[in-house]
A protein has these predicted regions:
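Bacterial N-terminal signal peptides
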Residues: 5-16
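Terminal presequence/propeptide segments associated with secretion/organelle targeting
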Residues: 17-453
Length: 453
């Protein structure tokens, strides 16, 4: 049984770009001019869509790094002031928060340390000069376990350290910390990822699949809001979304800068897949939860305002006013024993790996919601209808499944084959539009046995 997952994106509305807006690069301060002891302000959203300011002091410039953040130098800084006291320091979702010294942009908050008791005030920033390269060309590949070196020791989380390891996997962070020398700290990207609408079992499968990529999944946090999207500015909260509708998967980051209709966000990669086609959405922040081991933003994602087209090591880049390509998934489940009908609809980013991963989980969630249970004996009659550009007519496939233990999982097996045909077809290039999954469930066993031949 292949365990797979689904990401969603639905087109609600698209904010039009401002007519005649100048594509002007902000005033920047090169990293060579940034010195320890310099102070400045950063911008982020901690409630609604209002951009607030925090204060920071540069502690050091870390050298010779790499890894998930594709820069060989990072800025070590201390966050302070009323906003820092309110949030408990840095929080997941603040990635991309622009940081200025004397009105000049130096970079974006990108990573926080794995464990700081009390106030999480020490963090890392990606230099803006490395981020701007993402608008023009890919970042170079980096090593698996980078180590940045400080010019002098610093106290972080009660430890005196002069080396920092950056890992994309928050699940590994504390384990790495325990096995590293006492003078080495561990930091992870400050991003929050949430899912909504999946069944508990489907969500566990998704978490297991995404754990190697460093996504720490928060189930049930976030959602869609009907709020009006405000014009973006440095410090605005935005959403990155791969699945949208009755099932959702995405995250919240912060805008570092906006140049014409192009935006830079996060200061680190999402999945580091290079050329991509994710949805860029409006976002509002409900609150910042001060939790251990790290605080995180809880927010809502709104209308689609553009597309994320670059997912690189130093930043994520997007274009306002363009729509991502979407693959529609509709699942209808009828329980013949109870007469109940359950329907889920979602839009998935039209990437073959994402559609193949997420679509079966949408179907699994619908079946488990219809039966109000995970697993169990039963028969499923499944009808798949696939539409795609390049096909003379829709492809329809009907099949029957029976299981003594888990009819829900058995019933989604054909979905994988349908997606293989749609996205991995060697004979003809197809552009899949949608897949409809109609499932009829019953407890009655409808099988036969050959008794003689």
């Amino acid at each position: 049984v292949k365990r797979v997952v689904v990401l969603l994106v639905a087109v609600l509305a698209m904010a039009a770009p401002v007519v005649g807006e100048a594509a002007q690069t902000p005033a920047i301060m090169p990293l060579a001019e940034v010195r320890p002891g310099m102070r400045g302000i950063g911008k982020t959203v901690v409630f609604g869509q209002r951009v607030d300011e925090f204060r920071f002091e540069v502690l050091d410039i870390l050298q010779s790094g790499g890894g998930p953040i594709g820069s060989d130098k990072l800025i070590l800084f201390r966050m302070f002031g009323p906003l820092a006291e309110r949030t408990g320091g840095t929080a997941a979702g603040m990635s991309g928060s622009p940081m200025y010294i004397n009105g000049r942009l130096i970079g974006a908050l990108s990573a926080a340390f794995a464990w700081q008791a009390g106030q999480r005030d020490i963090a890392l920033a990606t230099p803006i000069q490395d981020m701007l390269k993402v608008l023009d060309r890919p970042s170079r590949p980096t090593s698996a376990l980078p180590t940045y070196h400080a010019s002098r020791p610093h106290v972080i989380g009660g430890r005196v350290v002069d080396r920092v390891v950056v890992t994309a996997d928050p699940f590994r962070a504390l384990g790495l910390l325990a096995g590293l020398p006492a003078n080495t700290a561990v930091a992870t990207p400050a991003v929050v990822t949430f899912t909504r609408g999946l069944s508990p079992r489907a969500n566990r499968i998704l978490a297991n699949l995404l754990e190697p990529k460093g996504h720490e999944i928060l189930q049930g946090h976030g959602g869609r809001g009907d709020f009006a999207a405000r014009p973006l500015e440095p410090g605005s909260s935005v959403g990155i979304q791969e699945v949208r509708g009755d099932v959702e998967f995405g995250g919240i980051c912060t805008v570092t800068t906006k140049i014409g209709n192009r935006v830079l966000v996060c200061g680190h990669p999402w999945e580091n897949l290079g050329d991509v086609d994710y949805a860029l959405t409006a976002s509002e922040v409900v609150t910042v939860v001060r939790a251990l081991p790290r605080p995180f933003k809880v927010g809502n994602l709104g209308q689609i305002i553009g597309v994320i087209d670059q997912d690189r090591g130093t930043a994520i880049a997007g274009t306002l006013g363009r729509l991502p390509r979407l693959f529609n998934v509709r699942v209808v489940v009828t329980d013949q024993d109870t007469g109940s009908r359950t329907e889920l609809g979602a839009q998935v980013v039209r990437r073959r790996d994402l559609a193949r991963a997420f679509t079966p989980l949408i179907a699994l969630s619908a079946i488990e919601r219809a039966r109000n249970q995970a697993g169990g004996e039963g028969t499923a009659i499944v009808k798949l209808t696939l539409r795609a550009k390049g096909l003379p007519a829709p492809i329809v496939r009907e099949n029957m499944f029976y299981s003594t233990q888990d009819v829900a999982t058995a019933s989604v097996l054909d979905i994988v084959d349908a997606l293989e045909l749609a996205f991995y077809n060697d004979l003809r290039a197809l552009e899949p539009y949608d897949l409809t999954v109609e499932t009829v469930l019953m407890k009655r066993r409808m099988t036969a046995s050959i008794v003689d031949a």
